[in-house]
Amino acid sequence: IRCGKELGVAFVLISMGHSGFLPYPERKERLLCSLDRIRREAEAREQPVVLETLTPLESDTCTHPEELADVLDSIASPLLFGMCDVVVPFVMGEDPVNYARILGNRFVHLHLADSNGYDETHLIFGEGCMKVEQIMRDFLAAGYNSRATLELVTHYIEDPSRASQRILMKAKEFQL
């Protein structure tokens, strides 16, 4: 949070971690305790923080928009927000737009990537099996008009320059 403030970033993104399979009550208590520490630091530095859910394989603390809304309600800070990596709900068989519907004005960021349809692998937006044009239309129809990031992750580590060129072409194609 301190570095984000010094760099002048719009927000700092924090992904939900994994508790190591603690029982739910202990897991939730630890999550809220950690997020309250983050809240205090964010408020002291006036630095917005965005929380990202992950899939159940990556996190056992917060994986659905309803859980994220509950966490944001519990912490209640004007500087804590939620976001959606569209691959996460897609591989879980959920509608990514539910994040916008459930979080409302606390929903401030999208990670746009595509999916191979069976795991967390992130492909270039528009090169997988997701109906990306429909997803974009649905987010716009839900009133979302904030930030988005086109994600390139480890799948493209061998040739990131070529992948960057492809993702920029896709951004132009989708007018992002």
Where are each of the predicted segments found?
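Histidine-acidic metal/acid-base catalytic patches
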Residues: R2, G8-A10, D36, C62-C84, ...
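Active-site acidic/histidine proton-transfer and metal-coordination neighborhood
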Residues: I1-F81
